[in-house]
Each structure stands twice: as C-alpha cells, then as structure tokens.
From Swiss-Prot:
It comes from the Eukaryota. Residues 668-716 form the GRIP domain. Keywords: Behavior, Coiled coil. The lineage of its organism: Eukaryota, Metazoa, Ecdysozoa, Arthropoda, Hexapoda. Disruption phenotype: Adult males appear unable to discriminate between males and females when choosing a mate; either because they display increased levels of courtship behavior towards males (when presented with only males) or they display the same levels of courtship towards both males and females (when presented with both sexes). During male-female courtship, they also begin courting virgin females earlier than wild-type males, suggesting that their increased tendency to court both sexes may also be due to an increase in male sexual activity. This is Protein quick-to-court. Residues 1-42, 143-210, 360-379, 393-428, 441-471 are annotated as: Disordered. The gene is qtc. InterPro entries: GRIP_dom. Pfam families: GRIP.
Length: 721
C-alpha cells in the first residue's frame, strides 16, 4: 500500500519563467496533456507544475549512504521534503538516480532508476525547491540521521503532485517496466521542463525564521515557520471535470495534506507505517470526501487485496448495482406471482358468492350480482353441497392488463441492461478508482440516472410507469379490467344456474333409478325368505332321517356280529365232530389191523414214520392257531384244508389211543364210536370235494370193503361222467 501526499505549488517567482515558455507551446503540446486521471483536479493546460516524489526504500545502510543527498535532515526521512540545489559534484555522476512517480499498485516497494533524458529536469527540481525556501540543512540535527539509519526499513511515498512526474521517462526500457508492473494504468506523460531561475539564498529564510520564533513537530517544514504562502488553487483555468469545493480559504487542500503528513509522522512509532489518523473518513466510497469535501488520504479496506481479488471502487459500485438489480428482478417476479394469485383468489371469491346466492330462494336475491343477501338458515351442509371452483383461464391471464404491463417492464429491463453493459464497457478505463475523472460523466450522476431509470420502470403496484400518456393508459386498463370482471361475473352466474338445474334433474333421475333397484332387491329378498321358510322343514326331516339311519346302522352291525359268532360256533362244532369221527375211524382201522394180524407186530420204522407225520401236522396246527389268534378279532372262519388237517390230526391221536387200548383189551369194540365216525366221513366226503379221496378211503376202511371192492370204487370215481 502506498500513501500519496499531493501538493501543487504555484509561486510568483516562477510565473516569469512560465511566460517565457509560451513560445514553445506548439512543440510540446503533445506532452503537456495528461490522459491519466489524477486525484486532485487540475486545469486543462498547466504551465508550471512540479512533482516531487521521495521514496525511501531498502535498509538503513542505504539510507545512510543517501544522507548527503537529502539535506532535509533526519537521514533523508522527514514529513515534508526540503529540496535545495544539488551540489555540482553530484551533477557529474555518470548514473544519477532520479525519482519518478509510479502509480502502479504492483510496484510498491521497488525503486526505479532511470537515465535522465534532459539535464534541465534536475535544475527545475532544484529551482522549485529554492523558490519554496525550505532549506534548513544547517539547522537539521545530525541525530535524526543516525536514528533513521539504525531503524527498520521504511516504505514511504510522499508526492507533491500537480499531475506529472519529475523525471521524464521516455526510453523503451522504462516504458516496458511500467507496463509490466501496471497493466491497467496508463503512463503519465512528462511535464514540460522549466528553465532554471535565479536561486534564492537560504540565508534570507533563516533570518525570517530567527525573527519569528516558531516551534512545532514539523520543525523547518512548517508553513508558519517559513511564512511562505502555498496555494494549491489553480489560478489559470478551471477544468469542467473539477468537482465543487468549499471556498473556505485560498489554500483549500493544504490543511488536509498537512494533516495527512502529520498523521504519518506521529504514528510511525507505535502503529503501522501506512495508517491514518484523520478525524473523518470517506462517506460515499470515494476519495472526494472529508471534513471540507476535499481530497484526503485514507486507508482503503480493499488495499491489501492483490491480483484478481482486488476490485476498484468503480468495480465494487458496479457489482453492488448488479446485485441490487438482481434483487429488484426477484422482487418483481414475486410481485407478479402474488398478482396472479390475487386475481385467482378474487375470481374464486366471486364464484363462491354467486354459488352461495344460487342456493337461496329467488325472492331473496338482490339486484346486484356482487352483493347478494343469503338466508343462512336454509344452507345445506358441506356434505350435501360442494362449492364450484374453476381454475383461471391462462388465456385471460395473458390478456389481462397486468400481463401486458409485465411484458413492457421486461422489455424495458432488457434495454436498460444493454445500456448499462455498454456504459460499463466504455468506462472500463477508469478502474483506477478516480470517479471524478471519467470522460463521459460523473459516477454519481450516472448512478443517479440509472437509479431513476430503474425506479421509473416500476410502480409500487408492479405496473409499468410510462412517462407520456401514463394516466390515459391506466384509465383504459382499469376500464378494460372492470369490463372483463363484469363479463366473468355474468358468465359464471349463468353457468352456475345451468349447473344447478342440470344437477337437480340428474339427482331426480338418479333417485328414481335407485328406487327401482331398491324395490327389485326387496322383492328378491322376500322370495328368498319364502324359499328359506319352505326349506327349513325339509331340513329338519332330513336331520331326523339321518338320526334314524344311524340307529339302523348300529342295529345291523350288532346283528352281523352275532351272526358271525354263531357261524364260528357252528364251524367249531363241526370241527370237533370231524375230529371225533377221524378218531373213531383210526381206531377202527387199528382194531381191524389188530384183528387180521394178531400175531404180527408193528415195526419201529412205521411208528417213527407215523410220529414224524404227526409232528408235521402239529406244526401246521400251531401255525393255524396263530393265524386264528391274529384273526380272532375279525371272527374269521377256518378254511377247509385247516379243518381237515385238524380233523386228521385228532383222528390219528384217537386211533393211536384206541390202538393202544385195543392192544390192551382186544375183545372190547365200541360200535357207537364206529357209527359216529362213519357218519362224519360220509358228510365230509360229500361236502369236501378237494379231499374226497381221503374221505372215501376212511369210509371204505370203516365199512371194511375188500381190495377188489376198493379197486372198483376207485375205477368208478376216475371214469368221467
């Protein structure tokens, strides 16, 4: 950040030299006009303006080396520079260092060395300093030099500027460096050089100081101590770009410049080097503000920003304007939406009022369609009646006067934005922050004009504000709106009446159809009841029949069980009889055998064979008994084979027993047993066809047939019948 103190000097001693330069105006006219805006307004053609820029850069050692070149005292560091004639020994340097003005924000802290183009620039600087009578080299203390040399490096730029640089930089190297460091700032042309004037001895100034003792912190730089009148007012010509100032004193800007320098000198010890101590600050965002509406030096809040983040006051103001315009557009859109909603709600209210009026009797309606008296006691509930609310037609909304006014507003906004974009493009060269130096017009006047145009495009109602004929258009729009409103009211009233009539007819038809359906359903229900009453006795009879059949089933099951038991008993009795008959027959055979061969004896082999056959039959009987146990629950009958095997077994046992008894007492024969045995053999011979041959042999043995008779019987059985 760079602090600039600008001071323009105009001395009577120099005016004579200004008159001498009028002959050379045509040759140097191109160099006198400054195209770059400056902070302090100046006349269009200034004959004598001197700019002294003292920049202290680097370290204390460098300041110590330059102490002899800065006779102002304090080691070349003071709040106001005192410029005297440079000794002749310094004029012969091959590379003298000249200080030039650098307005770029990027070159802060850099020292610019240039080759002098004209030797007269140094002389002009020295003569101007001599005319100011600020030579206090003899009175300056040497202690300040050492103290400043031992201090920290400073970054100070004191500019006593009337709009031009001290050293004219016209070479290509200096211009290229200036362009690289400040691409957005144009180069300031050089100031026409002033020929050397007679030097004013410094002893006169010292004598005047001695005569009027004065002491302050500014030491020899104080204006009161020097008693030199410094005027910053341009006495030659006033430029149209010069802003209005308060004519308090001839030295209008001097007090503020002195305050700025004083604030810098008093705050270097405890605060930042570039801070400001002004009792007033900028009010409108520009440098043209202050206690007396003068040019002051103040610290900007955006000074620390560099690169793309930095915005000039013009850019900040334009960004603020764009943001406000966006907010204005958003507010207008919200207003349009609210207007549309208001129109829709108005129509709904009208429709509801008409619908409410239609529900009352015709004699209670009033003549006006807007105000309708309704008998509240006869209104139906919300379940019986539903209000008719139709949506607003889009075509009517687009044809409304508000929609037309919105279209006009949008067109005006587009044209206004185009004008503002063109104005921003034209004023882009003024991004240095000097609002008052714009070539077109003042920023404040342009902002006020833009604001008036933006405010003129819309009224508080959101309708277009037209300059010429606005009253007539508004009246016609209101009349059209009222006509449309009346037409809508009449149309909706007619529609509501038609809907009510159609609804009544539809309701009556629906009731009739529903009554017919209800009667048909009631008739069907009666028929169903009759059928049900007829079917109930049948159902009871069927249930009784089912109970009777269940009883009969139980009786039949009991009878079946009894019959099976009887049959089993009969089979068992027949089996027992068969066993007894077999026993008798075996006994008879054994008896016959014993009678025929009394002397023969039964061999052991025959007995063993009979015993084996008997054991086999016993095994069969055991198996049959097991099957009988398994089937005993079902009361199953024995088969014929099982009965015969059991009978044969029993008969053999009986025969064996009787054989043994016959052997014991051969004389005893039981005819009853023989008869019973014969009876059983004949019965089974006739009934059991499968074992008929065995039964036949038993009969033959019981009846004691001979072998010839047995052969004839067997032959007769083999012949087919």
């Amino acid at each position: 950040m760079m602090t600039s103190l600008q001071l323009e000097t105009s001395l009577p001693a120099v005016e004579e030299q200004v008159q001498r330069e009028k002959d050379n105006d045509s040759a140097e006219d191109s160099h006198t006009a400054s195209t770059t805006p400056t902070r302090i307004p100046h006349p269009a053609v200034a004959r004598f303006r001197r700019s002294a820029s003292l920049r202290l850069r680097g370290n204390p050692a460098e300041l110590g080396l330059r102490a002899e070149h800065c006779p102002a005292g304090g080691g070349g560091f003071s709040s106001r520079a005192k410029l005297t004639a440079i000794p002749s020994s310094l004029e012969t340097r091959s590379h003298p260092v000249h200080l030039r003005r650098n307005r770029s924000w990027c070159n802060l802290g850099h020292k610019t060395e240039q080759e002098p183009e004209v030797e007269a620039s140094t002389e002009a600087l020295c003569n101007a300093a001599q005319c100011l009578s600020l030579d206090k080299e003899a009175l300056a203390p040497k202690v300040g030099n050492s103290s400043m040399a031992n201090g920290k490096p400073r970054n100070l730029s004191l500019q006593l500027n009337g709009g031009s640089d001290i050293s004219s930089s016209g070479t290509s190297s200096s211009s290229s460096n200036n362009k690289e460091s400040s691409p957005r700032t144009t180069r300031t042309p050089r100031t026409p050089q002033t020929p050397q004037t007679p030097q004013t001895p410094a002893s006169g100034v010292a004598a005047s100081v001695a005569e009027t003792p004065h002491s302050c912190i500014r030491q020899g730089n104080c204006v009161k101590a020097n008693q030199v009148k410094l005027s910053t007012l341009h006495e030659s010509k006033i430029s149209p770009r010069t802003p209005p100032v308060t004519p308090d004193s001839p030295s209008t800007y001097l007090d503020d410049d002195i305050d700025s320098m004083y604030s810098f000198a008093t705050t270097t010890s405890g605060r930042s080097t570039m801070s400001c101590e002004h009792p007033y600050v900028a009010r409108n965002g520009t440098t043209f503000s202050g206690r007396k509406m003068k040019y002051v030096v103040h610290c900007s809040n955006y000074a620390g920003q560099v690169g793309p983040d930095y915005l000039t006051p013009t850019q900040r103001a334009q960004r603020q304007i764009r943001r406000l315009k966006e907010l204005l557009c958003i507010a207008r859109q919200d207003l349009e939406q609210k207007d549309t909603e208001l129109l829709r709600l108005t129509r709904e209210v009208v429709e509801l009022r008409l619908f409410k009026a239609s529900l009352s009797s015709p004699e209670e309606r009033s003549a006006s369609s807007d105000a309708v008296t309704v008998r509240e006691a006869e209104l139906k509930t919300s379940q019986d009646v539903s209000p008719i609310v139709d949506m607003v037609d889009e075509g009517n909304a687009k044809g409304s006067p508000r929609h037309l006014s919105r279209q006009q507003q949008q067109q005006a906004n587009h044209s206004l934005q185009a004008m503002q974009m063109s104005a921003e493009m034209q004023s882009s060269y003024a991004d240095s922050g000097h609002f008052e130096d714009l070539t077109m017009s003042s920023v404040h006047s342009k902002d006020s004009q833009t604001q008036s145009e933006a405010c003129g495009t819309a009224t508080p109602d959101g309708e277009a504000d037209v300059g010429c004929g606005a009253g007539g258009d508004s009246a016609s729009n209101l009349e059209n709106y009222e006509l449309q409103r009346q037409e809508l009211i009449s149309m909706y009233e007619h529609r509501i009446e038609e809907l009510i009539r159609s609804q009544d007819s539809a309701t009556s038809d629906l009731k009739r159809s529903h009554n017919d359906k209800v009667e048909a359903l009631l008739q069907k229900l009666a028929e169903c009841n009759t059928r049900y009453s007829d079917m109930v006795p049948d159902y009871e009879q069927a249930k009784q029949r089912i109970r009777e059949l269940e009883k009969q089933l139980e009786d039949l099951q009991r009878k079946l069980i009894e019959h099976e038991e009887k049959q089993n008993k009969m089979y068992l009795h027949m089996y027992q009889q068969g066993q007894e008959a077999e026993r008798i027959s075996r006994a008879d055979q054994a008896l016959d055998l014993a009678q025929r061969q009394p002397e023969s004896k039964v061999s052991i082999n025959e007995l063993l064979h009979q015993l084996q056959s008997t054991q086999d039959e016993l095994e069969n009987i055991r198996a049959s008994e097991c099957r009988m146990r398994e089937c005993g629950s079902n009361h199953a009958l024995l088969t014929a084979k099982e009965a015969i095997s059991l009978w044969v077994l029993g008969a053999r046992k009986t025969i064996y027993r009787r054989l043994l008894e016959a052997q014991k007492n051969r004389t005893h024969v039981d005819p009853e047993v023989t008869l019973q045995f014969l009876k059983s053999a004949i019965f089974y011979f006739l009934t059991d066809k499968e074992n008929s041959q065995g039964h036949l042999q038993a009969i033959e043995s019981i009846l004691e047939f001979t072998d010839a008779e047995k052969q004839k019987i067997s032959a007769a059985n083999r012949t087919p019948k």
